[in-house]
A protein has these predicted regions:
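Acidic/polar-rich alpha-helix caps and helix-coil junctions
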Residues: 5-23, 33-284
Length: 284
């Protein structure tokens, strides 16, 4: 599957101030919060996660503390206010009244975050648009295989040391501490291992089309931490004009509906009508 810098995907990942990008490929706060800290622990467990809001100077810019000391995959996946765009090295801001604010264009990231993953870091200006750059689409990759293997072992043999070994193959490449070093006690604890595998899949495979199916095959789409329905949050794109600090207030973006029937797709009526032995999926 071919993708290029001039394609709709790249445009939706590009800020409006950078060659009038569409900047609509937004990332939810819930995904942002699921990335680990640089010590390999979740934000709920890590002492590095700030107890109070505030800012830290990074490259001369005030960066919100919640985005400091995160793992490398966070910085490669999420584009946030104050980060520099790789083409012209411009600082990008999204607050209301900024160059990329909701008052400047109807195309704005609803959550105040842009997807950065898969954005080509080597694009340069060519007239009014970036150069075309071939990027293959991700269908199946080695990290997915490693985590599926760890998942199978978790369900069949939770004391098998290969579980941590294969999760750690992914974590090592990601540049974060290994579970064998920081959480060896979870080996043999099936529930803890399930959570470890699932959290790793959430982060490593984010925006690759896996999460939708993962939470359904695990039958956890109504469980805290995995919910596909309910309230979803982001940064405040509609604060007072020019008020940069108002942007950092987390606000409700949308309420989604998930019902039990959504664990399975409905069988098309045309197929059900072919045979009276064909039974429609539950609740449809």
């Amino acid at each position: 599957i071919k993708s290029s810098a001039a394609s709709d995907v790249y445009k939706r990942q590009t800020p409006f101030s950078e060659q009038k990008g569409h900047q609509t490929a937004a990332v939810m706060q819930e995904l942002v919060d699921d990335f680990f800290m640089k010590d390999g622990l979740s934000i709920e467990e890590s002492p590095l996660y700030p107890e109070e809001p505030g800012f830290t100077k990074v490259g001369g810019q005030d960066i919100y503390n919640e985005w400091i000391n995160r793992e490398p995959r966070f910085y490669q996946s999420v584009f946030y206010q104050g980060k520099k765009w790789q083409v012209k090295n411009n600082v990008i801001e999204f607050y209301y009244g900024s160059k990329n604010g909701a008052d400047k264009t109807s195309n704005f990231p609803a959550t105040g975050y842009l997807l950065f993953k898969r954005t080509c870091r080597k694009l340069y200006n060519q007239g009014s648009s970036p150069k075309v750059q071939y990027r293959p689409s991700i269908i199946f990759r080695l990290a997915d295989f490693y985590l599926l293997y760890a998942e199978v072992l978790t369900e069949t043999d939770p004391a098998n040391p290969k579980i941590l070994e294969y999760i750690d193959k992914v974590r090592k490449r990601a540049g974060i501490p290994l579970l064998q070093d920081i959480r060896p006690e979870i080996l043999g604890n099936q529930e803890a291992l399930r959570e470890a595998v699932r959290r790793e899949r959430r982060v490593e495979l984010c925006t690759e089309g896996q999460r939708f199916f993962d939470v359904r095959r695990w039958m956890v789409a109504e469980k805290d931490g995995y919910k596909q329905g309910g309230d979803f949050y982001g940064m405040n794109m509609f604060g007072p004009n020019g008020d940069r600090n108002a942007f950092y207030k987390k606000v409700l973006i949308e309420n989604r509906i998930f019902e039990k029937k959504n664990y399975l797709y409905p069988i098309p009526l045309s197929q059900v009508q072919i045979s009276n032995q064909m039974v429609q999926n539950p609740l449809w």
